[in-house]
Regions:
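Extracellular pro-sequences of secreted precursors
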Residues: 1-218
Length: 218
């Protein structure tokens, strides 16, 4: 997903091969409704596993070089623990006219697992030759047995450039698309690209014999 919540992320440190962003969870409320507890935050993202605990997710898009490989890791700086929490399970989208059903994965809620299994998800994407990392953080640990919810308040997210990457084909830059691309990345102010821009072209769509006329040649 290209959705991102940059207000929760700020640059902390940067070197030639290493960038550190600091995550701050900001406003957060843990409330109760019926037998379940819910989490409200300023995030637009939520975990989507139906019947499993619904947790806020936070993400940003980071521009990268198409000829480099990257690794991302995180360090938790501060956290808070909430006791006796039963996190509300995520529900499917309600369709008008259909009977509302409540779904809860009882097997998961009675397990010894920690949820979520991964707190950091990284997806490399290519948009017409423009490369980026979509970095998603789920700053929570939920223990089904103890009903303990750990909330990461502050995290360092470390992006490391690790090695060269072989390219099969280099797509030229597009001035129009580059302007759109910069709106989606957190590091637009330091974005660099050594590729050449593509030459402007005009596409003609015609029929009949017009393409062979003198007017068309002119």
């Amino acid at each position: 997903s290209l959705l991102y919540s940059t207000n929760n992320f700020s640059i902390k440190d940067k070197s030639d091969n290493n960038t550190i962003y600091q995550f701050d969870i900001g406003s957060l409320t843990v409330g109760n409704k019926s037998e379940f507890d819910y989490i409200e935050s300023n995030s637009n993202g939520r975990t989507q596993q139906i019947g499993a605990p619904e947790l806020p997710t936070y993400s940003f898009n980071y521009s990268i070089q198409n000829n480099k490989n990257y690794e991302v890791e995180y360090v938790v700086n501060t956290f808070e623990i909430y006791e006796n929490i039963i996190v509300d399970p995520a529900q499917p989208l309600q369709i008008a006219g259909e009977e509302k059903q409540f779904i809860k994965n009882d097997l998961l809620y009675s397990s010894f697992q920690q949820y979520p299994a991964n707190n950091l998800n990284v997806n490399r994407m290519s948009l017409r030759g423009y490369e980026l990392l979509n970095i998603e953080i789920i700053p929570f640990e939920y223990n089904f047995q103890t009903k303990q919810l750990k909330v990461y308040h502050n995290i360092d997210i470390i992006i490391n450039e690790t090695s060269d990457r072989e390219l099969s084909l280099e797509v030229p830059r597009s001035k129009t698309f580059e302007a759109i691309y910069k709106n989606y990345i957190i590091n637009a102010d330091t974005y660099q690209d050594s590729r050449n821009f593509q030459q402007p072209a005009i596409l003609y769509i015609c029929g009949g014999n017009i393409e062979s006329s003198l007017y068309f040649d002119e």
